[in-house]
Amino acid sequence: MNAIVTHLINEQYERGNSHIFLYTKCNSAKFFQSLGFYEIARIEDKLVFMENQRKGFANYLENLTACVPKVQARQRAAAIVMNANPFTLGHQYLVEKASRENDIVHLFVVSEDKSLVPFSVRKQLVEEGVVHLPNVYCHETASYMISSVTFPSYFQENENAVIESNALLDLQIFSQIAKALGIQRRYVGEEP
């Protein structure tokens, strides 16, 4: 088994993919740890989400906290995760509402380029659309939130199990991000 996994890892490196993610069953996680993978999140009795960078997720959290003020006692911090494909007046309304109701708003723009509008354009539109809100901080989601990497389906028997696992994994990862940034609220909107 080691030889097969090593071969697959080498294939990814040859394709230019140096940051590798994987899902495994909980009882197989130690095997992948022995091959240089590190746990990001776990859904007990279901799956473990791992990466091949020892401090990949920790570095992501560190970069997030380095560019924003620390939440003080009695301050409210919120988060919004959006694709903004493209950034609309509805998106802007949600951000402005969160900005009025909180001291700090962390606005995460989905980084993965799987949308009609490229990420660089979406990010620029979002930043321009919230420039008048001094308490809003824009971040990239990287591969850790709302991406093809963070939505597992391979280990799930049915569609309901897939939906449940997606929600639980998002919750596990986001709770670590929320803790690092002092986030107490998460705003959610609906695309038309």
Please give the residue ranges for each predicted region.
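A conserved short alpha-helix in the GNAT/GCN5 acetyltransferase fold that borders
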Residues: 4-14, 33, 99
